[in-house]
Amino acid sequence: MKKLLCVVMALCLTMACALAEEAPALNWEDFAPALEAGGVTGQFYTFDEIAVAIWMPEGLNPVELTEEDVANGYIGYFAPDDQSAAVSIVYVDVNGMSLEDYTAQLESAGATEIEPGTVNGLPCVSYKLAEQDSVSIAFTTEAGYILEVTCTPLSVENAELVWGAVVASIQPAA
């Protein structure tokens, strides 16, 4: 419990610093030491479709995608055995839509707490969907696609910290 409290406090300080700026900037190098100090483990997964790597905490396991999932743009889905949480990674053709245009669509779709920022230098927009109890982050790509990572549930204890670490890990694959 003390390790988790240490991680929570360190991540809160990191997030407070990031949120103090006009456009929040998250960097994996800021989160990784706090996770390590707190004994929080996980591993990176690489998505070859977009040359991106994303860290998942231990206990979130890759779920095999169906043909329908793939047809709907899913390139990754992670959940614990009890299905009490999930992280989905979707890569969808939006015909070259800009991040600003995508943000406008989010507003009309009822998203809240829409916020532009950067993650490891990549421009993005984050938002929440109350009816889905989720937080998402979206990036545009040079190929005219949107990469969107959605984490749920958001309403459980420490969810924002865990999901914050997942989001902060999104980076170009080495």
Where are these regions (language model features)?
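Bacterial Sec-dependent N-terminal signal peptides
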Residues: 2-3
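N-terminal targeting sequences that direct proteins away from the cytosol to non-cytosolic compartments
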Residues: 6-11, 15-71, 143, 150-174
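Short, hydrophobic/aromatic-rich segments at coil-to-beta transitions
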Residues: 38-44, 71-76, 118-128
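Second-shell loop/turn segments in exported
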Residues: 44-46, 87-95, 114, 148-157
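Secretory pathway targeting signatures of secreted, lumenal, and periplasmic proteins
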Residues: 46-96, 130-131
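Short, conserved charged micro-motifs
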Residues: 97-101
